[in-house]
């Protein structure tokens, strides 16, 4: 995947989280969303992207309230500001 495709993938993830806000989403839901956007990822590749975006403070990964072992992702205020600045909302 080249740099432009990675940017589009990251935008797809962030926009999906923005649409769900303030609710967090599990990785499996994000996988379905990026597949609908035309990206084919496995669990590991998605986790790498989520970790990257979390490192940039654009999203946060938290454990599920019902099961601590199941992570969920949520858009941060910084992530929303980024999407607004890029006219993606």
Segments from the language model and where they lie:
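Short alpha-helical segments that sit at the start of domains
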Residues: 1-24, 89
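Short acidic, hydrophobic short linear motifs in intrinsically disordered regions
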Residues: 23-34
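DNA-binding alpha-helical recognition surfaces that contact promoter or target DNA
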Residues: 32, 48, 81
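Short amphipathic alpha-helical interaction segments
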Residues: 40-55
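A short, conserved structural fragment
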Residues: 54-64
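Minor-groove-contacting beta-hairpin "wing" of winged helix-turn-helix DNA-binding domains
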Residues: 66-75
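Short, amphipathic alpha-helical interaction segments positioned at domain boundaries
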Residues: 74-89
